[in-house]
């Protein structure tokens, strides 16, 4: 497989949807970003794309309730899933979000990879593990980003990284773990490399459409 290098700076917003029934047709290829409400998911997307306002960062964790789609090129999309695990959100809303997340991960056929973001100081909370379990169950590869890595000294960061790598072995899935910091740009290259790999598995029909478009 030839790895294609994508220009993530060209990524643009497409649509916000409450559930998978309101998303575009289930075709092309998608990589989803998931994490607790305070894990730094929006900041990671903004850093990846070098666009400060692409994904809205909220001062009130738990405010983002929709599935947000961003297009890199035709048929290649990044998906910002609703943040989870915020204590002050009503229980009914929590359950609604969890249903939407589970349904997307289990039923969206064009999903080819899942990026789960966790604060490096508080990794693998129950809902993080649930996301990983859902992904592994349907054979979706996972990249775990331990965010806010700049909050730890180099030695402590490496120790925490190794601890999480040991802890995820029982999940028995295709799971990679990397340290990440939007502020210090730690792990951004690793994220881009993984996305390029996943997106290089793009279906032939999408590649054909891109090629036809370039010839116009």
From Swiss-Prot:
GO cellular component terms attached to this protein's record: cytosol
Ligand binding (Mg(2+)): 42, 64
Record-given protein name: Probable GTP-binding protein EngB
Keyword field: Cell cycle, Cell division, GTP-binding, Magnesium, Metal-binding, Nucleotide-binding, Septation
Coiled coil: none
Purpose of the protein: Necessary for normal cell division and for the maintenance of normal septation.
PROSITE patterns: G_ENGB
Provenance organism: Yersinia pestis
